[in-house]
């Protein structure tokens, strides 16, 4: 399972750990992803999505129906 938000498309980024002495070592910044079930009233069923917390806020703002319509328009199976 890839670490990509289905709503926002957020994925891991690469950067550095920087110590007090400014030694740099490579690291990954992972998105805050959650497997979450959303109730879809229009379809009378739950939909399971892998979303970041920002994606959850977008769903709260625009509604699950609009977000699902956008996902289906992109060709994603939900």
From Swiss-Prot:
One GO term describing the cellular component: cytosolic large ribosomal subunit
Protein's name in the database: Large ribosomal subunit protein bL28
Protein source organism: Psychrobacter sp. (strain PRwf-1)
Superkingdom of origin: Bacteria
Pfam families assigned: Ribosomal_L28
InterPro entries listed in its UniProt record: Ribosomal_bL28, Ribosomal_bL28/bL31-like_sf, Ribosomal_bL28_bact-type, Ribosomal_bL28_sf
UniProt KW Metal-binding keyword: no
Keyword annotations of the record: Ribonucleoprotein, Ribosomal protein
Any single biological process term in GO: translation
GO molecular function: structural constituent of ribosome
Similarity comment: family membership: Belongs to the bacterial ribosomal protein bL28 family.
Coiled coil: none
